[in-house]
């Protein structure tokens, strides 16, 4: 039997680099900057009550050609396709008021990413030349990232992307879900209206207590390595999750209920189906038992039946 290693919860993020005259020295410095940036973001976020738990390094770094929209689009498509678990994309921009800034906003919205643009010059000097102090800069970014993550989770127009074909520019379709669709799903799962029966309910669990900015991908990561078949967000920090079978639900509850993500977030995980307590058996009293024994010991009288 192979035991799966259950990694602690870490949100994944990616970096897009659009820099003029990019060379190996700049690449090495940006890799070092990425770790410094995410750690500083975590510390400053905790100071104002926003607790980020991103991995220390980006899961991928994608380079694009300056001033090339197709190159920029391909970078976001690549992240979306190859790393669907990515929540945050940090885009290193070549200069202020660049086209890449506008493209970043459009593409991040299209593929459902939280975005944060940074000027390369500020990255190179670690924000030493900005007008405001470094703490304020990072706390403003923390607030933006938190609000953006919450907006993605609650946005009525949040879409699933479907790519058709193998061409360089496949067709991209959006499937929109409005609040009524979500509300119907919640009622079907949690209430008596068309409630799932038997095996369907046994495959579901309730999870709460995680950071409110998480979207469905982030919630699924919490339950690694179990296979998540569906997620319905029921509140700012609660959701109903469908797993593969009832055995995975049982094991996931054992593994994750009460798990601390950080000092302010503790998971609460339970099965959607609450087992009914066994009906207690009513044993006869000693006096009644003796009476029953006496009755059993008496001879049986048969009445004569006339034919």
UniProtKB/Swiss-Prot annotation:
Residue stretches in coiled coil: none
Gene disruption: observed consequences: RNAi-mediated knockdown results in chromosome segregation and cell division defects in early embryos. RNAi-mediated knockdown results in defective activity of the PIWI-interacting RNA (piRNA) silencing pathway. RNAi-mediated knockdown disrupts the localization of tofu-6 and erh-2 to the perinuclear region of the germline. Instead erh-2 accumulates in the nucleus. RNAi-mediated knockdown results in decreased expression of tost-1 in the germline and in embryos.
Stretches that traverse the bilayer: none
Biological-process GO terms, alphabetical: 21U-RNA metabolic process; cell division; chromosome segregation; embryo development ending in birth or egg hatching; piRNA processing; positive regulation of cell division; positive regulation of chromosome segregation
Compartments it resides in: Cytoplasm; Cytoplasm, Perinuclear region; Nucleus
Signal peptide span: none
GO terms under cellular component: cytoplasm; nucleus; perinuclear region of cytoplasm; RNA cap binding complex
Keyword Cell division: yes
Main location: cytoplasm
Entry comment describing in which tissues the protein is expressed: Expressed in the germline (at protein level).
Keywords (A to Z) from UniProt: Cell cycle, Cell division, Chromosome partition, Cytoplasm, Nucleus, RNA-mediated gene silencing
Function: Component of the pid-1 and tost-1 variants of the PETISCO complexes, which have roles in the biogenesis of a class of 21 nucleotide PIWI-interacting RNAs (piRNAs) that possess a uracil residue at the 5'-end (also called 21U-RNAs) and embryogenesis, respectively. Within the pid-1 variant of the PETISCO complex may stabilize 21U-RNA precursor molecules. Promotes the biogenesis of 21U-RNAs. Required for chromosome segregation and cell division in early embryos.
Assembly notes: Component of the pid-1 variant of the PETISCO complex (also called the pid-3, erh-2, tofu-6, and ife-3 small RNA complex) containing at least pid-1, tofu-6, ife-3, pid-3, and erh-2, which is required for the biogenesis of a class of 21 nucleotide PIWI-interacting RNAs (piRNAs) that possess a uracil residue at the 5'-end (also called 21U-RNAs). Within the complex interacts with pid-1; the interaction is direct.
Name by which UniProt lists this protein: Protein pid-3
Native species: Caenorhabditis elegans
Gene behind the chain: pid-3
């Amino acid at each position: 039997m192979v035991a799966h290693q259950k990694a602690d919860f870490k949100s994944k993020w990616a970096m897009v680099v659009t820099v003029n005259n990019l060379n190996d020295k700049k690449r090495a410095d940006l890799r070092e900057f990425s770790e410094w940036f995410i750690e500083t973001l975590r510390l400053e976020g905790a100071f104002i009550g926003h607790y980020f738990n991103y991995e220390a390094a980006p899961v991928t770094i994608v380079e694009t050609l300056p001033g090339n929209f197709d190159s920029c689009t391909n970078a976001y498509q690549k992240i979306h396709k190859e790393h669907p678990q990515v929540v945050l994309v940090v885009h290193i921009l070549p200069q202020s008021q660049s086209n890449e800034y506008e493209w970043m906003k459009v593409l991040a919205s299209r593929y459902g990413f939280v975005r944060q643009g940074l000027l390369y010059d500020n990255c190179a000097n670690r924000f030493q030349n900005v007008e405001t102090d470094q703490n304020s800069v990072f706390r403003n970014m923390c607030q933006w990232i938190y609000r953006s993550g919450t907006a993605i989770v609650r946005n009525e127009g949040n879409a699933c992307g479907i790519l058709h074909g193998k061409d360089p520019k496949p067709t991209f379709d959006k499937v929109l879900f409005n609040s009524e669709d979500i509300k119907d799903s919640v009622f079907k799962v949690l209430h008596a209206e068309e409630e799932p029966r038997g095996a369907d309910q046994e495959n579901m669990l309730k999870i709460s207590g995680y950071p409110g900015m998480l979207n469905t991908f982030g919630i699924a990561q919490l339950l690694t390595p179990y296979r998540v078949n569906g997620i319905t967000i029921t509140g700012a920090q609660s959701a109903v999750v469908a797993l593969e079978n009832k055995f995975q639900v049982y094991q996931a509850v054992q593994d994750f209920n009460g798990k601390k993500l950080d000092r302010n977030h503790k998971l609460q995980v339970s099965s959607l189906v609450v087992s009914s307590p066994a009906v207690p058996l009513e044993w006869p009293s000693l006096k009644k038992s003796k009476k029953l024994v006496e009755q059993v010991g008496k001879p049986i009288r048969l009445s004569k039946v006339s034919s």
